[in-house]
UniProtKB/Swiss-Prot annotation:
Keywords: Cytoplasm, Fatty acid biosynthesis, Fatty acid metabolism, Lipid biosynthesis, Lipid metabolism, Phosphopantetheine, Phosphoprotein. The modification O-(pantetheine 4'-phosphoryl)serine is found at residue 39. One of its GO terms (cellular component) is cytosol. This is Acyl carrier protein. Gene3D superfamilies: ACP-like (1.10.1200.10). Residues 4-79 form the Carrier domain. It is found in: Cytoplasm. Pathway: Lipid metabolism; fatty acid biosynthesis. Pfam families: PP-binding. Belongs to the acyl carrier protein (ACP) family. Carrier of the growing fatty acid chain in fatty acid biosynthesis.
Length: 80
């Protein structure tokens, strides 16, 4: 899966979960600062990423995912 395909799938998940316009999401979008996500929101989102992409994201790695770009990079580098 290409980086662009991953980015678009992640944007879809974010738009559904955080009720934001998909077009407003960039790789620099910060989950906590820009989307007002709290720690529970982030845990739920990480679980959705795991389901969507079939990847397991350890807690120590999940803590490093602060932006949409971080999520894209992690999925890209850990896909089968």
């Amino acid at each position: 899966m290409s980086e662009e395909e991953i980015f678009n799938k992640i944007k879809d998940l974010i738009a559904d979960n955080f009720e934001v316009d998909k077009d407003s999401i960039t790789e620099n979008t910060n989950f906590m600062n820009d989307l007002d996500a709290d720690s529970i929101d982030l845990v739920e989102f990480i679980l959705q990423l795991e389901d969507e992409f079939g990847a397991e994201i350890p807690d120590d790695e999940a803590e490093k995912i602060k932006t949409v770009g971080d999520a894209v990079s992690y999925i890209k580098s850990h896909q089968g």
